[in-house]
Structures are given as structure tokens and as C-alpha cells.
Amino acid sequence: HAYDAYMREYLKMALEWLGSTRTPVILLSATLPESQREEMAKAYLKGWRNSKLELPSEAKRGGIQELKRRQLAAKNEKVYVNEPKLVQERGISSVHKVSSAYPVLTYTSDTEIKHMDVKPSGRSMNVRCQIVDDSDEALISLLDRLLEDGGCVGVICDTVGRAQHAAKLLSDYFGSEYVKLTHSRFMDIDRMSNEAELRQLLGPDSTVGNGERPQRMIVVGTQVLEQSLDIDFDTLVTDIAPVDLIMQRLGRVHRHRRGNNECDRPSLLREAACYIRGIAFWNDNGPEFAKGVDAVYDVASLMESLAVLELTGSSAFCTQCLPKDIARTVRNAYGNDVRSLVPTAWNMQYDKGCEERANKQEKKRADAHSYLIQSVAVMNRKRSLVDWFSPQIDETDDDKGQRAVRDTQDTVEVMLLCKHDGEVCLLPWIGDKRNGIERGAVIPVDTVPCDDVAKVAAQCSVRLPVALCAHGRIDSLIAALEEGCGTEAAYWQESPWLAGKLALFLHEDAEKHLSSDELCGYTISYSRGDGLTYTKKEDN
């Protein structure tokens, strides 16, 4: 789900080329909108149609279809195949109407796009979704009530800043031993450790009975909690987000069965619930979103999410039946009739948001084509690698092509290391016991570090916040980092693990806090519990 209008252009071109080479592709998503499924399938078939490879014979194609049916039948799954009248569009056939079932399998057959309804797993649940106030006091009060008898709650925030603020707030009230924080501003090695710990504590095999699952725990994080982690919360608090992401987040509530009728969960948390915050206040003409939330997601998409879920007031609530409601809810949010679901009083603000979103997406699509390879059809005509890329990268922007796949603001990745008594070291808790690297080990600067030390140092990488790189400051930031490395990094360029990497040296004060010298008007701090934080010089 790390894609947007910009990255989709790259994804479609990749699918087109994979189609041209007859390469099977599987895309898995619980919440992919119908229009995007169709868009991706058409991109694949566009390449398939323009391929120069020999098409399989009718007999072979029939054998493949029969094999598919036999494989499904062998699993004793009752499969419903929807094959209504096909609509021809530029050589590609597509079903006229997609089934409303969930799950649904979309697949290509020669030049046709087809859909197959697959029987659900059998487990379903109702999740009560409710709007709550965005204030600090409301968050503390809510969790204080919910965790009266214990339990494990997830708090998903849309920005790292909101997550760090919530974690500190909750740590101060409930105690830091009950609160864990995870987000993208942890060093790679710490982030992997955080996620491994969460899987151990909240995974399918951890229970209160076997001593693995905590009696009480609050996990605060960003979107990393909605992606790939097989963890299970007793209840969830989340910032508002586009509806497909809300559905992803709901999948972390009561993800695994905990006894008959969830009897192994605390009594107050046996009914699945999700509390949605991130709305600063409600105006007559629509919601005003909290600072930072509308910087991550388009206002129009957030309003559509609220409208589709019928959460249109400060005390609104609804019930979602999972997985049955996923397809319908996502389809409504991304369908052509979504405006009719938005309250009339919101229309002015919503229309403005739609216009801003459309302009932004059009710019993203146009920007993506600057460094997109040529289509299969064009290459079939020109047949020259020289023509594969249309743009020319000049010396002033020779790395733009490498950055182009993700439409993110330019930022810089650094290794966080510690300077102590004139030596460069790993951070105090960082080491590799398996390979004999002690915590806080010294990294040599007068010789090439051995591979074991260099690999650990390379895993101490993190991206600096966008704020440090804004307004064209990235060149001066890189220059300051290079100057800060001085001669310490000279021998590191001979290491395949460290060559070309920038380092930011932190210093430990009397209270064991790690922070940098001033860097382009900012001070960078890092801790094992909070990750990377930064303050402007005038804020110090």
C-alpha cells in the first residue's frame, strides 16, 4: 500500500512489461479499490497484447483453465465464477460489473479480465467504529477506561510527530513500562527489533496463559502497524485515514480468536471496537482535521472516508462487519457516486478538496512520466535500448532518476554513531552478539573496519526528517554532514558496507541523552524508546 498516483504509473509500466514477457504476476491486497484492480489488469494485458512471444495453443489454454478448476475443487472450495457479457475496449475484454463478494479473485485470461468469487474463510466479526475527541485529555480518559481490567491496545497515528507525542503522553500517565513506540524514524536495526518484539508479544501464538501476551500494553505507532505485521490488539485507536487504510487497520483488532467468544480477552474488550480521532473540531461546513493529518492524506479522501462510514459528527458511530463489508465500503469510497454520500453541508469544502486532489494527482502522473521507460508498443517499433528512456539526465541532477520511483520529498539517510573519548562507537545498546560485536563497540577510523562491525554500523541508518531538507536545503545539509564526518570516514570508503554513507555523530551527556551538534539550525536527538527527534535552534 506504499503507492500513490505517482508510483502507480511506475507500477502500471512494470506490469505492462511483465505482461509482454508472459510473466505470471500475483498482487495481493485486502482493500484494493475496484478501479485500481481494473487499471492494473489492463496494464498487464496491454503488454500481453503487444508481446512478440508466441501465444499458447487453444488446447494448451483449455488445459490451463481445467487445471485451475481442478486445483480449486481439490481444496473443497465452492467457487462462483462471474462471466457476464464482456465489453470490448481497445482489444481488451473486461467484465461489465464486478461482483460485490469478498474475497474476489481478479485474473486475466488471454485478453480478458475476469472475476471469481471465492468463499470466505468462515470467520467474521463486527467492529464498532466511533468518533472520539482529539485532545490529549480525551485520549488518556479513553484508555484509562478501556484498560481498567488490562488489555493490549494499539494507537495508530498518521505522522511520526503525533505518535511520539502520544507515546510520551501515555508513558507519563500509565508508565513507560506499559508503552511501546514504533515508527519510521528508528534506525533500521532498532525498527526490526521493535517489530520482532511486537510479533512475539502480540502474535497468534502469544497468550496470557502461556505468559507471552502482556496483561496490559499500549503500542503507539504509525502506518507501520497496518502493514505486514501479524499482531492482534484487544481494541484500537486510530487517526482518520482514507477508508481502505481504515479497513487495513481494523484488521489488527481481534485478528486472532482468543478463546470461545473472546473469553481470554479482558471483559471490557471482548467486543471489537475502533476509536477514530484526528478531527480537531467540527464546523457546520465539515470537519477540520488535526495538524499533520491533512498533510499526509488529501482532505477530500478523509471526508469521503467519514461519509462512507457514516461518521459525520463528533459522537457518530457505525458497525463494520469484516470481511463482508470491506468490498462494499471501499467501492463506495472510490466509486463515481461518492459525492452523493457526502453531507450536503460539506459540499463547498469537499469540492475544494476534490479539486486540490485532482490537480495534485495530475501533477504526480505527469512528473512520473519524466523518468518512465517507454511502453512495449513503442519499443516494438524502435527496438533500440537508446530509445528505452525518453528523458536526459544532466549533471546537475544525476541522481534524480534513482529517487524517481517514490514521489517523496528529498531527504538524506545517515548512520547514527556515537563519539566518546575521541573514539567513534556504535550506540551504547547496539551490537551483534552472534558475531562477537559488543554493544557500543569501537569503529576504527585509522583502518578499514572489518565486515562484521561495518554491517552493524550500516544497519544504524535512518532518514533525517523532511524539515531539515526543505526549501532547497538538501545540498547544504549534505555538505554539513560531509564536513562533520571529517577524516573519520576516509577509510570507511574502502568498506563495501560503508562506502558512500554519511554519518551523524551523537554525543552522550551526563544524563545519558544522545544528541548531535547543531546541524543546519537543528539539533538531532535519538533514544532507544523514542527514536529520532529534532528541535530547531530557536526552540532549544
Where are each of the predicted segments found?
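Residues immediately C-terminal
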Residues: 1-5, 33, 162, 227, ...
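Short, flexible loop segments at the rims of nucleotide/cofactor-binding pockets, characterized by
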Residues: 2-5, 128-134, 214
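Conserved helicase ATPase motor motifs in RecA-like P-loop NTPase domains
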Residues: 2-6, 15-45
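Conserved interdomain linker/interface between the two RecA-like ATPase lobes of SF2 helicase motors
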Residues: 23, 27, 47-158
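Structural recognition of the conserved hydrophobic beta-strand(s) that form the central parallel beta-sheet
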Residues: 24-29, 217-222, 275
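Short, glycine/acidic-rich hinge or "gate" loops at secondary-structure transitions
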Residues: 30-38, 53-55, 264-266
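C-terminal helicase lobe and adjacent C-terminal extensions/tails of nucleic-acid helicase motors
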Residues: 37, 126, 130-133, 137-200, ...
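Conserved two-lobed SF2 helicase motor
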Residues: 209-226, 238
